[in-house]
Amino acid sequence: WESGDLELFDLVEEVXLNFY
C-alpha cells in the first residue's frame, strides 16, 4: 500500500477498535 493508504488504514483500525 501507499503511505496515504497506510495512514488511512491506521486511522480506520484505530476507530474500529474504539467502536467495538
Curated annotation (Swiss-Prot):
Topological region Lumenal: 1-20
Entry's Gene Ontology molecular function annotations: DNA binding
Subcellular location: Endoplasmic reticulum membrane; Nucleus membrane; Microsome membrane
Topological category with respect to the lipid bilayer: Single-pass type I membrane protein
Primary localization: endoplasmic reticulum
GO cellular component, as recorded: endoplasmic reticulum membrane; nuclear membrane
Name assigned to this protein: DnaJ homolog subfamily C member 1
Annotated ranges, domain J: 18-20
Species annotation: Canis lupus familiaris
Top-level taxon: Eukaryota
Keyword Membrane: yes
Keywords: Chaperone, DNA-binding, Endoplasmic reticulum, Membrane, Microsome, Nucleus, Transmembrane
Record text on subunit structure and interactions: Interacts (via SANT 2 domain) with SERPINA3; the interaction delays the formation of the covalent inhibitory complex SERPINA3-chymotrypsin, but does not alter the catalytic activity of SERPINA3. Interacts (via SANT 2 domain) with ITIH4 (via C-terminus); the interaction protects ITIH4 against in vitro cleavage by kallikrein. Interacts (via J domain) with HSPA5. Interacts (via cytosolic domain) with ribosomes.
Keyword hit for Hydrolase: no
